[in-house]
């Protein structure tokens, strides 16, 4: 992803992104993947982990009805992600969670409890402030306080941004 590439360019050691849409060994909806990542965390192989949970699985912009299997897959992905976040935090690994600023994900009780318990910093920014043609307000919540320097609000003239529209569908089953 872009964040991984940016970290690599400034000389930080990075791992290949673990992605829901990747090969099965990198699919967070699989218990074996989660167990492996937990073992790496406990072994001290990570200093920081970023979680960008697909917002299309739980989007307020989508009006399509989800099947029971799709809902179960979404819940499994969220449960596994929260388990990994808690594992990282309990082993001294900095954590960053990224999602659109208006996402209802930020209102999930388990995430709110984690954020309070570990004193996360909230960082809001507009993508246009980092060279994107669209505004797209984003939010990071992080235990890495230095990331607060990324906070930016849009200062562009009105109507200059590309309009993001349409409906993106992402398979949530892994």
Task: For each feature predicted by the language model, list its residue ranges.
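Conserved active-site and SAM-binding loop architecture
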Residues: 1-174
């Amino acid at each position: 992803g872009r964040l991984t590439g940016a970290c690599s360019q400034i000389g930080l050691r990075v791992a290949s992104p673990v992605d829901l849409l990747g090969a099965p060994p990198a699919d967070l909806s699989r218990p074996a993947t989660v167990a492996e990542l937990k073992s790496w965390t406990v072994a001290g192989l990570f200093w920081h982990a970023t979680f960008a949970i697909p917002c299309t699985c739980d989007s307020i912009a989508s009006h399509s009805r989800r099947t029971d299997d799709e809902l179960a897959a979404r819940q499994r992905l969220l449960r596994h992600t929260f388990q990994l976040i808690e594992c990282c935090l309990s082993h001294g690994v900095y954590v960053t969670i990224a999602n659109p600023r208006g996402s209802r994900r930020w209102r999930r009780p388990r995430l709110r409890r984690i954020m309070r318990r570990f004193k996360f910093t909230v960082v809001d920014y507009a993508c246009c402030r980092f060279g994107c043609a669209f505004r797209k307000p984003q939010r990071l919540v992080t235990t890495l306080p230095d990331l607060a320097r990324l906070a930016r609000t849009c200062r562009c003239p009105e109507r200059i941004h590309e309009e993001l529209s349409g409906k993106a569908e992402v398979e949530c089953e892994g």
